[in-house]
Amino acid sequence: MNSSALNLIQFLESSKIQVPGGLKSVKGILDFDFYDLVKNIGESTSREEEVHIIQNEIIKLKSCFSKEQSKDKKRECLIRMIYCHMLGYDVPFGHIQALNMTQDSEILNKRTGYLTLSLCLPERHELLIMAVNSILKGLNSSNYLEVCSALTAMCKLIDNDTIPAFLQKVLQLLNHQKPIVRKKSVTVLHRFYRLVGDSFLDDDQIIDKLRQSLCDRDPSVMSASICIFLDISEKHSTLKDNNNQINNNNNNNNSNQIKKKNNEEINRSKNLISMLKELVPSFVGILKQVAEGRLPNSYIYHGIHHPWLQINLLKLLSNLGYQDKDSSNHMYTVLLFTMQQSQKFKNNVGFAILYETIKTLTLIHPNLQLIEQCSKNIAIFLKGKHHNLRYFGIKALASIVKVSPKLVLPYQVEVIESLESPDETLKRKSFDLLYKMTNQTNVVPVCSKLIEQLVLSKDQNFKSELISQITNIAEKYSPNDIWYIDTISTVLSILPNENNKDNNNNNNNNNNNNNNYQFAYNLIRLVSEEDDIKVKQHISEIYLNNIMISNEQQQQQQQENQNNLQQFSDIYIKIMSWVISEYSNLIVSNNGVIESDIISYLCDLLEKDYQGETKSWIIIGIGKLVAQLGKSLPMLELMTKKFKSSKSLICQQRSSELNEILKNPKSMSLILPLDAYCEDIDFNKIFNKFNDYSNKVGGKQYIPYEKRKNTPLVDISDGSSSHSNEKGLNFQYPPPPDPFNPHHNQQQLYPVHQHQPPSNHQQQQQQQQQQQQQQLQLFPQQPQQPQQLLLLGEDDTINLNNNSLVPVNNDQQLQPHQHQQQQQNQQQQQQNQQQQQQQNPQYPNNQLVTVPDQNAPKPIGLPKPSKVLWTKKGFVGNKQTPPQNATPQQQQQQQQQQTQNTLSQQQIQKHQQTHNNIDPEKEKLAKQLFGGFSENNNRNENSNNTDNNQNNVGITSKLQNKKSNNENNINNNKKESYLEELIDLSPNLISNINITNNSNNNNNNNNNNNNNNNNNNNNNNNNNNNLLLVDVEGDEQKEVKNSSCSSGNSELINLNLDENTTKNINGNLLGDDLEELNKN
């Protein structure tokens, strides 16, 4: 073998045939022992033969290292040892030989030693410390090749402990003359950053060196530095999300050290992001130079200059432009140019840059013009014959859907064809796109398509993805409860059985986690908490029909002697047993199904191979059905005896409980009541019995929790503590903001502060207002044209002429209490408007009249409000801000948007004309799936998303709202019962509460109600409270039911209170009210 190979090389050298340089170099480095090893391993036919060959080779290598050999022979043995290590065999005997080889003066031997150590030595090995000396010698060498070999070895052999020994030397090498040394030095810094983390960049010297390398003249050094910045941006691109997680950890952790560390991480990440965003113009400039082709020809690959550098720059810009409008504005021009340049090259590299550019434009702050341009370029991918191109086209569409869903419309046929593609990866990505484009209008056809694929698919991973997608969109966009129940029940019936051996062999993890599906338990909550009986009847009909069908199939297979009946999943059996046991009584008479038949079917399910927890659910369901039936069955005694000795402890417990319940038939309905899943337990009754029992035995009397801590129920603090901010009802609201002073009272609408008696100045103002009102009644003024006020925003208000879009009467805002004058002004205004409409019927309501150009867009006018008044809740009326007059630049932008919309519509029409020969079934499916987008083409995407989120309440949020409401009701009931207990235990109280009827006060209350000045009356009129809590002589409270304090009645409550009592309730009532009460 060896002689023939040597003869071949000698023949080639002696002949005139040119011998390849690579073959000559291999001949100089290796002998033919390595060739024999590789050939014998390739020709081996079994694992045993391969092991035998490797063991013999290891014996040969040990004998070679034990003898004195030449350096070339040792180098060849190290290469054979690397090959054995690559096949998975341990070669610890050669580590010391490789370390000695790194100290050789010949560069080839030194590089072989470094390569062997970096590949064969594990992390944190003892010999790594011994390699530090040889690496430092290599870094200090005058030969740049030795320096490069040492830097290459550092990327694999250095750990956190040895970084300080090399850092300063690596920073010095960034100024080396050779660009390859500078490039490898930047790569070593990148390795240091990955080992240490963000704290490595705390040194300003390192950041300055990285910026210097970014501006290096050699493109290889520049591309190496881009990789470091890319890693930093990927780690800190989602800064807000990371900060929220860290803040949540701070709230959960009580340790000051952990909080301090987390705060340091937040500050460090902010500094790094700000540093990177300062470099955005530099990154944009580099991308522009590379796209223009200013690099040397050695960096050209398939006609494109340095495509990997362009891709890294695009990823970096996408991370920095995420949710940052200022940074994104620097990128738009260069990204458009890069996209245009990539379209010139119809090869894989050009397609890769085009796809990455589209992805970047969808991730940064969106520019609709550029995104529309991206959607046109997606046709290059989708019309390609190769599945890989279509795969990237579907991925690009999925990224565009997040920004502008209507741009998917021209490619609806291609998407539907991809859904039926034989390529599995393309099909999965198409269904992912279908999931992302789901909205409230197309949720039904999308779910049906996903369920259809769920039935046909055999890949368990793909099935788990489809199940999560179906349940997510069903909970988010469910049109009604019936549809949600049908969808989730269908998904549960399709789920595979966990105990099936084939499924366990395929994917144990997914099948064992079926019990963790939250959507199944949401289904139980929805049905149990729903008040509509039709919902409960519907779900019980579904599961009872499934029982009947499965019984028929089982009987047929028993007759045919077959046992291939597909079992349902454990989670499906749990839901089915619960539903049937709770609500089967609603439809038993309609379907002719008897409880005994259902019980017998459930007993048959116990014989099948289900989990112990699932069988416990079945036993509980049988117990509920027996309670409804009112008698025991013979089969149940056998069943309970059998499962008392079950391997599952929970089955033993449930069967024992059922056996005890069957002994007392009268107590069945009490222990297992009908439809009592969501009934609230009254703990007061339970604990009162415990309290009575402890009193009889001689225990101590129960003391409430509030009294144990000596905390009063009502604030009885002195006037000295009146300035403390305490929680309580606020009976005062601020005065209306001055419309002519926009900076007044904008931050806090309802400031909480202590109430003070009115000053003399305020009393004088009230008297002047009353005198003005009397004068207006005697001498009514002529109605004036109301001054127009244009509300532009929170900080800007501008007085305009009578041609304002939103006429607002400033007098009404400044003096809302003048009710009679408002009525007179409104009557005069209506008369003037009628006259104006008769004169100018084309321009009613005195709105702004402009004569727009033909090409200019029409201004959008707001409707005239009836009233804009300041009340306790703020402004009442149409508060929408009218648009400003469009500037010439805005008019040009609006014209451009209109032309772009018309062009996009024309392109859609042309695209639809090209697909006239489409299968009608596909066309019908496309209308169903994409119908929601065609209806909302002219809407803004952001507003559309917000509207869907507001109008569309998911199942989970619905259940959470119900839960919070129930908890509030329970807490209110507890508070009321607790107050009653306090009143019962309190001593006899002395108080005089007189309710008198006073007509004068009635008139005053009506006037004050119109003027919004009497806060006490407003409280009664707005809240319609029928309960009045009065604190009398200390800590006790008394509940007085007052049916005459509603908004319709005008009776006055007079309380005869002592001075101490008035001091006690000064935190809840105003000072003015107290003075009036004391006077009365």
UniProtKB/Swiss-Prot annotation:
Keywords tagged on the record: Golgi apparatus, Membrane, Protein transport, Repeat, Transport
GO biological process: intracellular protein transport
GO cellular component terms, A-Z: AP-4 adaptor complex; Golgi apparatus
Membrane topology: Peripheral membrane protein
Localization, UniProt: Golgi apparatus, trans-Golgi network membrane
Superkingdom of the source species: Eukaryota
Annotated Gene3D superfamilies: Leucine-rich Repeat Variant (1.25.10.10)
Main location: Golgi
UniProt keyword Protein transport, yes or no: yes
Record's compositionally biased regions (Low complexity): 762-782, 801-847, 878-911, 936-952, 962-972
HEAT repeats: 161-198, 201-238, 369-405, 406-443, 445-479
Any Pfam family the entry gives: Adaptin_N
GO MF terms, alphabetically ordered: cargo adaptor activity
Region of interest (Disordered), ranges: 711-782, 801-920, 933-973, 996-1027
Subunit relationships: May be part of the adaptor protein complex 4 (AP-4), a heterotetramer composed of two large adaptins (epsilon-type subunitand beta-type subunit), a medium adaptin (mu-type subunit) and a small adaptin (sigma-type).
Stated role: Probable component of an adaptor protein complex. Adaptor protein complexes are vesicle coat components involved both in vesicle formation and cargo selection. They control the vesicular transport of proteins in different trafficking pathways.
Similarity annotation: Belongs to the adaptor complexes large subunit family.
Protein name: AP-4 complex subunit epsilon
Origin species: Dictyostelium discoideum
